[in-house]
């Protein structure tokens, strides 16, 4: 049986934590930043955990993490 390939786009977007959960970067921080206030942009810099519904999909994408 062949090896399962890792989905490279998912490998770049998600990191696995010590507890087995996955963290991701937040959206809305790429462009049109002048009208967003500093507090909002600072809040968006933090990483967040992915939802419970998406964990199973991400595990399929990243079989060797």
From Swiss-Prot:
Carries keyword Mitochondrion? no
Q: Which family does it belong to?
A: Belongs to the bacterial ribosomal protein bL35 family.
The answer to whether UniProt assigns keyword Nucleotide-binding to this entry is: no
Question: Which Pfam families does the annotation name?
Answer: Ribosomal_L35p
**UniProt xrefs under HAMAP family:** Ribosomal_bL35
- PANTHER family in UniProt: 54S RIBOSOMAL PROTEIN BL35M, LARGE RIBOSOMAL SUBUNIT PROTEIN BL35M
Cellular component per GO? Answer: cytosolic large ribosomal subunit
Q: Where is this region: Disordered?
A: 1-26
* Domain of life the protein comes from: Bacteria
- Please report any disulfide bonds recorded for this protein chain, giving both cysteine positions: none
Give one GO molecular function term.
structural constituent of ribosome
Which of UniProt's keywords are assigned here? Answer: Ribonucleoprotein, Ribosomal protein
Full protein name = Large ribosomal subunit protein bL35
List, alphabetically, the InterPro entries matched: Ribosomal_bL35, Ribosomal_bL35-like, Ribosomal_bL35_CS, Ribosomal_bL35_sf
Q: Which GO terms describe its biological process?
A: translation
């Amino acid at each position: 049986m062949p090896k399962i390939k890792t989905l490279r786009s998912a490998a770049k977007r998600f990191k696995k934590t010590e507890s087995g959960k996955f963290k991701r970067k937040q959206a809305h921080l790429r462009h049109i930043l002048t009208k967003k206030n500093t507090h909002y942009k600072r809040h968006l810099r933090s990483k967040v955990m992915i939802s419970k519904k998406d964990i199973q999909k991400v595990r399929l994408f990243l079989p060797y993490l």
